[in-house]
Amino acid sequence: MARLQQFYKDEVVPQLLKQFGYKSVMEVPRITKITLNMGVGEAVGDKKVLENAIGDMTKIAGQKPVATKARKSIAGFKIREGYPIGCMVTLRGPRMFEFFDRLVTVALPRVRDFRGIAAKGFDGRGNYNLGVKEQIIFPEIEYDKIDALRGMNISITTTAKSDDEARALLAAFKFPFKN
C-alpha cells in the first residue's frame, strides 16, 4: 500500500469526518484519478518529438501514455484530423498515490520561485487542475537527456461535491496552496 494511501485512511478520513460532520466514512471525499496531459504541437512536423514526449511521460507516470489525436483539421496550425498531437495518461490506485506523493513532496518544491499553488484551479465540482511549465521538476527526468522543455496539465479528480471539500481534502494531504 502506498504511503499516502495509508495516510489517507489513518489521518485524512477522521479529520474530514470531524470537519464536515459526515455520517458515513463513504461520504468522505477521495481522489479517484490523476490525469496527465501533454500537448505536443511540434509533433506535426517531426514524429520523433512525440516519441520523446511519450518517453518523458512514461518515466514521470510509471505507465505508458496513449497518443492523443487531433479531432478536426485546422489549416492555420497545419494539422489534419487524426494526426497525433499529444499524449495523456490516467493514473488510478497505488500508482496514483505514488505519483501524488512525488508531486507534493519532490516535484512542486523544485519549481523555480515556488510560493505555493493558486487555489483558483478548482472547477466548481471538486476537481483541481494545475499546469506545470517544464517536465524537469520531476526527478525521473535527466536534464542532459531532454530535447526540449515541455509543460503538462495535471488534473486531480475527486469525489468531493464542492470546491471547499476538495480543497480541504488536498490540504489534508499537505498540498502546498498559497495562503
From Swiss-Prot:
InterPro entries: Ribosomal_uL5 (IPR002132), Ribosomal_uL5_bac-type (IPR020930), Ribosomal_uL5_C (IPR031309), Ribosomal_uL5_CS (IPR020929), Ribosomal_uL5_dom_sf (IPR022803), Ribosomal_uL5_N (IPR031310). Disulfide bonds: none annotated. One of its GO terms (biological process) is translation. Coiled coil: none annotated. It comes from the Bacteria. Pfam families: Ribosomal_L5, Ribosomal_L5_C. GO terms for cellular component: ribonucleoprotein complex; ribosome. Keywords: Ribonucleoprotein, Ribosomal protein, RNA-binding, rRNA-binding, tRNA-binding. SUPFAM superfamilies: RL5-like (SSF55282). GO terms for molecular function: rRNA binding; structural constituent of ribosome; tRNA binding. This is one of the proteins that bind and probably mediate the attachment of the 5S RNA into the large ribosomal subunit, where it forms part of the central protuberance. In the 70S ribosome it contacts protein S13 of the 30S subunit (bridge B1b), connecting the 2 subunits; this bridge is implicated in subunit movement. Contacts the P site tRNA; the 5S rRNA and some of its associated proteins might help stabilize positioning of ribosome-bound tRNAs. Part of the 50S ribosomal subunit; part of the 5S rRNA/L5/L18/L25 subcomplex. Contacts the 5S rRNA and the P site tRNA. Forms a bridge to the 30S subunit in the 70S ribosome. Belongs to the universal ribosomal protein uL5 family. PANTHER family: 60S RIBOSOMAL PROTEIN L11-RELATED. This is Large ribosomal subunit protein uL5.
